[in-house]
């Protein structure tokens, strides 16, 4: 009986630890990695696999979700009051939309990857930066253009000069 209680308690502890809270200081990558050592290992693994700089991965997560694993875009309002549909299917640390996330899972053979898991999100960001480099010939070390391509998507990147909001966001990613 005592053994069963320990197993149940341990299981609950594991589940609760998976519900990661937002780091205290999201402005400093060293502080983030001191608080979340595994996050450093995950970003480093993504860097080794895809060549996406660690600072760029963190900048994308900061800008997209502010390190909130359950982040979603705000709902549109009907008559400025009634909550309505969300403008996109983006979710999690990377704010990846469902279609692109499914493409990532297929191409990387990661059927169990989830947008709410930091490890999978930074691997997705690394994959996206790598593909952006291959498709659009944007340097992996160019945060401005890489973020514009991430924000607008590969197809809409060519028209980014018309989107003032995208330009402002891209200037904030460093």
Predicted regions and their residues:
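Sec-dependent signal peptide recognition
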Residues: 3-10
């Amino acid at each position: 009986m005592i053994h069963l209680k320990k197993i149940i308690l341990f299981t609950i502890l594991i589940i609760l630890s998976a519900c990661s809270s937002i780091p205290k200081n999201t402005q400093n990558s060293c502080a983030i990695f001191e608080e979340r050592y595994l996050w450093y290992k995950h970003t480093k693994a993504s860097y080794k696999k895809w060549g996406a700089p660690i600072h760029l991965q963190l900048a994308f997560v900061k800008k997209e979700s502010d390190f909130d694993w359950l982040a979603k875009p705000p709902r549109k309002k009907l008559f400025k009051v009634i909550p309505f549909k969300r403008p996109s299917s983006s979710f999690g640390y990377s704010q990846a939309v469902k279609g692109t996330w499914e493409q990532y899972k297929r191409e990387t053979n990661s059927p169990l990857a989830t947008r709410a898991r930091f490890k999978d999100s930074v691997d997705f960001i690394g994959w996206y930066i790598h593909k952006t480099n291959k498709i659009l010939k944007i340097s992996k070390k160019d945060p401005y253009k890489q973020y514009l391509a991430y924000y607008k998507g590969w197809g809409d990147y060519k028209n980014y000069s018309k989107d003032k909001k995208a330009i402002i966001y891209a200037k904030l990613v460093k």
